[in-house]
Amino acid sequence: YDLLPYLPALAGEVIGSAEASDRFLDDWRLTLGELITDNLYGQVGRIAHEQGLTTYFEAMENSRPFVGDGLAPKCKADIPMAAMWARTQTLNFTQKMFLEMQADLMESASTAHVFGRKQVAAESFTAYGPSQGDSLVYGLYPAMLKRIADLEFACGVNRIVIHESAHQPIDSMVPGLSLDIYGMWFNRLSTWAEQARGWTDYMARSSYMLQ
């Protein structure tokens, strides 16, 4: 149908009737979602495959949803991906931010089940630095992070992608360089780096068994 007469509905005007306006707005949002899915995620996937690359699409996360079906962009990925931050709000399993991220994990797992993907990835343990006022900062350690990893596994994730491990060229610059304000700060200068093997083995073995 002709789009032009209904455009004022985007500014809150009722065109024809409330029902007709709502139906137009539903069509509008659905179309935007389809265009973004096909022309961004679909196109990137096609180009990547032409170059023999595997795609991970961390589409929408918890607080950046665009209009459309959440599974649609993720199904364009070879490995659908979610995110789970290591923040004070997410370590408290009742906080709204935690619940939103849990939904993102489960949405990615659902995408894998519906579209036949064998792996579900998650950007894991992302944290803010001091400038954002999070009290955790460099205080994150494996016993604390295990709660998040176990939650990811329980929600269907089977490939943990640790965020982040910046290159550390200067031994004396402790606790090390970072990705701007973002952690967690997983590198050889961490105070528990030499004791990390049990933790990394746990994540690797759990991921392998779940895959």
Task: Show which residues each predicted segment covers.
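Carbohydrate-binding surfaces of carbohydrate-active enzymes
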Residues: 1-80, 85-211
